[in-house]
């Protein structure tokens, strides 16, 4: 506990639980706490009602707040990349942080990780703790090689940055200067709005800012500050010029003026003025235009390239059809801003004038309406696609006033009737180019396990999220600590079931090591203490990849052996707070360990058992050292006997002694010599350990003489009696005598070492040493690939709903874990397939790198359609979004087929290169875009007929008015697949 004393556990639990519910307010400061430390604290205070069995147990005492796991090595302030809220860290408001620090202190040498709450979004306000600050590179105009890096909040202003730069380069306030935003090798943009924030200015991670000082003659080194287009301000992203005039006047755009200085031209006009767009080579192929990375925005670039190469959607925008369908009044839309911004970007990309453009205006508009995308952190490409398709749909929804629709269950009606009804109801509220191109219909069947009630509904979809066959196993690296005190820990790699338990881990380790599974105890060691001691029935999902798992061999059956008890042991180094005070403290070091010892024992025997347990890394003295009063080892010690730790229990094992002055905890204590034990026949010796001063079978001999000080004292905790204090030592050390000591399952020992003795006799390198088993080098064979159709079949497989996601049965009037089955009823002209590579759980995150074999052409989906009237439904691939790397990071690119020349190209941010079909199918494929073959005409796109845009997803034929339905019955074709041409 903190030196000044901590609040009782109930108060701690109540206070922090309340403060965790604090609402975010712009400008407030919150603090990051490593989730591992926080979980340990939750155990200690019994935070969760189901996890109170260790409440107050010093075995789980968290100690000082330790955020080292969040920081890059060697950097006290830089966070590791791709940390995830609640999985890697917990956010606490200032008051909560101050309370925890007052109770537990902060680890020495660490600084608080404080972050501000910023407000994101323009129309949809959203407060968020800015965990990752924006790193900017600062330099002077006259010396751009001297770059200084600083981190700023998105809420910091340009004025704040300028003051910091002036401070760094010793530029006086009275000296006139101006800031420039530097792009690439020789591209500059003035930052002339001091009140604008970093977010408003669109500054991104790693951006280079240059400060320029005015010459003595009143001129500027970089020339006049007025840009070629006086209206091309650099911060605002709201276009003043109409979209049509911009798209029709690319060549004259630099000559335009903006009357209202608060607004400016769209992003690409400013880029052209300042070379943000690379001029295309002569007759650049339309559509072969890269997108600059604004700082971790490759996810957005990949999504845009896939949509840009979706012919029906791009033709719609290039032909300005969107302008007559903009819906400015839709409360679910974005006032047409997303559609307009996207349209201008597409026109620029397909103008044939640029080899790449910078989509900053579009990025800013997206961030205004979807704050989760407003920063410059890596995001999920599919999540952006979902937002963008929905945003474009609502901005272009032809329905101006959505009617209320009462949803109905099938109630035994034919599927065709129910499907028709569902699609008609959908079109009454949702009618847009996005619906025309991307929306399909699937059938959902739920069956109640109690009353057998069957519920059938038909629901529209915009894309298919297909599960990948999951790996049923995972590999874990663990360390096995043998009973033999001379044996080094051995590292193993075990293959265990993903949904298995701790017993499965023990069984797998037993097969490799020969140690019986029932003689193992599995632990998680963190920060020199036991973070967790697992029960055999606990789920393996609670073990994360970064956990240090130690398995201890114990030669007793804990369920049957009533004579022994397993106790945790931790090592602590004592220190004094100052030379003039007697107040002492301690800090943990080394690896803790478990020991099985007799319940009824004497304290001196316990001391000797502990000493022998550490003999591999506790140095022995030579005869010369002995004469000087240094340590020596007792004789006749059984190293590998018949005790629960490989020790003989009847005698007193080795004693160590020094001539150091005794302290008050062990004054005048002397242990009698006990030499009646003989060496065991199966003793294990070391390899030249005696030459290195380490305790071995041969060196561990001798007897105690005189009044000597032991290597360490130890404190004993039996929950409910005296506590073991982490910071401030208790003076009531156990005295080393023969009085009986009764131990139980809640016993805990802390061994306190004097710093001088620890330095002299404790070999930390030997203590940390371990060996590797050959299994560590084993790489599990990976399944070569799965077919896309396997994923579709898995999507349509019947499953049981989870306990956390039950279905409300209208018949039982209760939530039930029903069985659910999805079936495809109809498919759209463009089918978007999302391969679900990322998986999340409470304890772990994972990316599946399974190779999915998908066809480039002739994907026949008819076998998966349950509509009995379904005809052929074949698709060709037109685009792929790729993700390289792991969870929370990596890089996105795209393959796409150009609609004009029919060739494949590879889009990697601003770079565009040719590609071949054999490159497209890879483990990186994440989102697939397929276009139905009947919507193509040659290499181009056969445009959608606006008059037949309402093709029924139920029958695949155009919807008719009531007046015409009877006359046209004979002309209808029984087709599926939402044919719209």
Curated annotation (Swiss-Prot):
One of its GO terms (biological process) is positive regulation of RIG-I signaling pathway. The active site is at residues 298, 891. Its EC number is 3.4.19.12. InterPro entries: DUSP-like_sf (IPR035927), Papain-like_cys_pep_sf (IPR038765), Pept_C19_DUSP (IPR006615), Peptidase_C19_UCH (IPR001394), RNA3'P_cycl/enolpyr_Trfase_a/b (IPR013792), Ub_carboxyl-term_hydrolase (IPR050185), Ub_USP-typ (IPR028135), Ubiquitin-like_domsf (IPR029071). This is Ubiquitin carboxyl-terminal hydrolase 15. One of its GO terms (cellular component) is cytosol. Belongs to the peptidase C19 family. Its main location: cytoplasm. Residues 289-933 form the USP domain. GO terms for molecular function: cysteine-type deubiquitinase activity; cysteine-type endopeptidase activity; deubiquitinase activity; identical protein binding; K48-linked deubiquitinase activity; SMAD binding; transforming growth factor beta receptor binding; ubiquitin-modified histone reader activity. Widely expressed with highest levels in the brain and spleen, and lowest levels in the muscles (at protein level). In the midbrain, strong expression in neurons including the dopaminergic neurons (at protein level). Widely expressed with highest levels in testis, heart and liver. The keyword Acetylation applies. Residues 7-118 form the DUSP domain. Residues 216-237, 633-694, 952-981 are annotated as: Disordered. The modification N-acetylalanine is found at residue 2. The lineage of its organism: Eukaryota, Metazoa, Chordata, Craniata, Vertebrata. PANTHER family: UBIQUITIN CARBOXYL-TERMINAL HYDROLASE (PTHR21646), UBIQUITIN CARBOXYL-TERMINAL HYDROLASE 15 (PTHR21646:SF28). It catalyses: Thiol-dependent hydrolysis of ester, thioester, amide, peptide and isopeptide bonds formed by the C-terminal Gly of ubiquitin (a 76-residue protein attached to proteins as an intracellular targeting signal). The modification Phosphothreonine is found at residues 226, 602. It comes from Mus musculus (Mouse). SUPFAM superfamilies: Cysteine proteinases, DUSP-like, EPT/RTPC-like, Ubiquitin-like. Residues 656-673, 960-974 have a biased composition (Acidic residues). Residues 226-237 have a biased composition (Polar residues). Keywords: Acetylation, Cytoplasm, Hydrolase, Mitochondrion, Nucleus, Phosphoprotein, Protease, Thiol protease, Ubl conjugation, Ubl conjugation pathway. The modification Phosphoserine is found at residues 229, 242, 961, 965. The keyword Phosphoprotein applies.
